[in-house]
Amino acid sequence: MAKTVVRKNESFDDALRRFKRTVSRSGTLQEYRKREFYEKPSVKKKLKSEAARKRKAKKKRF
């Protein structure tokens, strides 16, 4: 869980910016979006192999 303590004399915008940066670095939103809906194991397997195929093709190009 991302936690941000507002510093003395820090504006709300700066604190919000630091919080957003902390959340994005920790991967909280990505994890939430990944688990938002249930995926059947077969679909997960298909997506995983598709991603591997894309990575392999991209690596082959360069």
From Swiss-Prot:
GO terms for cellular component: ribonucleoprotein complex; ribosome. InterPro entries: Ribosomal_bS21 (IPR001911), Ribosomal_bS21_CS (IPR018278), Ribosomal_bS21_sf (IPR038380). PROSITE patterns: RIBOSOMAL_S21 (PS01181). GO terms for molecular function: structural constituent of ribosome. Residues 43-62 are annotated as: Disordered. It comes from the Bacteria. Keywords: Ribonucleoprotein, Ribosomal protein. Pfam families: Ribosomal_S21. Residues 53-62 have a biased composition (Basic residues). Residues 43-52 have a biased composition (Basic and acidic residues). GO terms for biological process: translation. Belongs to the bacterial ribosomal protein bS21 family. This is Small ribosomal subunit protein bS21. It comes from Levilactobacillus brevis (strain ATCC 367 / BCRC 12310 / CIP 105137 / JCM 1170 / LMG 11437 / NCIMB 947 / NCTC 947) (Lactobacillus brevis).
